[in-house]
Curated annotation (Swiss-Prot):
<feature type="region of interest" description="Disordered">
    <location>
        <begin position="22"/>
        <end position="66"/>
    </location>
</feature>
<dbReference type="InterPro" id="IPR009057">
    <property type="entry name" value="Homeodomain-like_sf"/>
</dbReference>
<dbReference type="Pfam" id="PF00046">
    <property type="entry name" value="Homeodomain"/>
</dbReference>
<dbReference type="InterPro" id="IPR050460">
    <property type="entry name" value="Distal-less_Homeobox_TF"/>
</dbReference>
<dbReference type="InterPro" id="IPR001356">
    <property type="entry name" value="HD"/>
</dbReference>
<dbReference type="GO" id="GO:0048706">
    <property type="term" value="P:embryonic skeletal system development"/>
</dbReference>
<comment type="similarity">
    <text>Belongs to the distal-less homeobox family.</text>
</comment>
<dbReference type="GO" id="GO:0035141">
    <property type="term" value="P:medial fin morphogenesis"/>
</dbReference>
<keyword id="KW-0217">Developmental protein</keyword>
<protein>
    <recommendedName>
        <fullName>Homeobox protein Dlx6a</fullName>
    </recommendedName>
</protein>
<dbReference type="GO" id="GO:0006357">
    <property type="term" value="P:regulation of transcription by RNA polymerase II"/>
</dbReference>
<feature type="compositionally biased region" description="Low complexity">
    <location>
        <begin position="26"/>
        <end position="49"/>
    </location>
</feature>
<keyword id="KW-0371">Homeobox</keyword>
<dbReference type="GO" id="GO:0033339">
    <property type="term" value="P:pectoral fin development"/>
</dbReference>
<dbReference type="GO" id="GO:0005634">
    <property type="term" value="C:nucleus"/>
</dbReference>
<dbReference type="InterPro" id="IPR020479">
    <property type="entry name" value="HD_metazoa"/>
</dbReference>
<dbReference type="GO" id="GO:0000981">
    <property type="term" value="F:DNA-binding transcription factor activity, RNA polymerase II-specific"/>
</dbReference>
Length: 247
């Protein structure tokens, strides 16, 4: 009986020591795992705190910019499509277009009302040359021989009598004066150019033109033979009657 009791006590002692050893092992394992958990928890906490701190730093420029915007004397517009330079550019473009339109209108006015006309490219276009009749040229030349310069009432009266505009009379007198001075410089006679084409009127200094044939004799009733028209050529021709007599 003593032997069985001793063996049972020995087994209990071994169990108690084994259980104590297991508890100690569990405690040591728990102590070893707790620092790793603490270490793992610390980086997470640091990461969380760092992210929170970083978030604060990220949000700080906005707050700083807001405070900076409040300190500026003008409002800062951060949108790229609403730049303050764009309205001025559009206003300048519209101003340039307005000036171009005004220039085109001015050119049109010059074309309609002015003496010197302009086309779309800005080049001068000469007005069509005025064609004067023989009667108008005769009256203008006669008036030019009297005076080379006309007053406004005289020019208006002459233009109305000839059916011309005052501008046409003015331009004709200007051209006539330039031709007159040019002929004087060359030493010619300016009055030789006063003859009118298709007109019988002659200048006083022009020599008399001899008549081609004299018709006064026929008007007086003087009989002229047919051979008198060709006196030197009658022997070239012979009549058929004379040819028969000679044969």
């Amino acid at each position: 009986m003593m032997t069985m009791t001793t063996m049972a006590d020995g087994l209990e002692a071994q169990d108690s020591s084994k259980s104590a050893f297991m508890e100690f092992g569990q405690q040591s394992h728990s102590q070893q795992s707790s620092p790793s958990m603490a270490a793992s928890h610390y980086p997470l906490h640091c990461l969380h705190s760092g992210s929170h701190h970083h978030h604060q730093h990220d949000s700080s420029p906005y707050s700083g910019s807001n405070s900076y915007n409040r300190s500026l004397p003008y409002s800062y517009v951060s949108h790229p499509h609403h730049s303050p330079y764009l309205p001025s550019y559009h206003s300048n473009a519209s101003g340039t277009q307005t000036r171009l339109d005004a220039t085109e209108q001015q050119k049109t006015t010059v074309i309609e009302n002015g003496e010197i006309r302009f086309n779309g490219k800005g080049k001068k276009i000469r007005k069509p040359r005025t064609i004067y009749s023989s009667l108008q040229l005769q009256a203008l030349n006669h008036r030019f021989q009297q005076t080379q310069y006309l007053a406004l009432p005289e020019r208006a009266e002459l233009a109305a009598s000839l059916g011309l505009t005052q501008t046409q009379v003015k331009i004709w007198f200007q051209n006539k004066r330039s031709k007159f001075k040019k002929l004087l410089k060359q030493g010619g006679n300016p009055h030789e150019t006063d003859t009118l084409p298709g007109s019988i009127a002659l200048s006083p200094r022009s020599p008399a033109i001899p008549p081609i044939w004299d018709v006064s004799a026929s008007s007086k009733g003087v009989n002229m033979s047919a051979n008198s028209y060709m006196p030197g050529y009658s022997h070239w021709y012979s009549s058929p009657h004379q040819d028969a007599m000679q044969r």
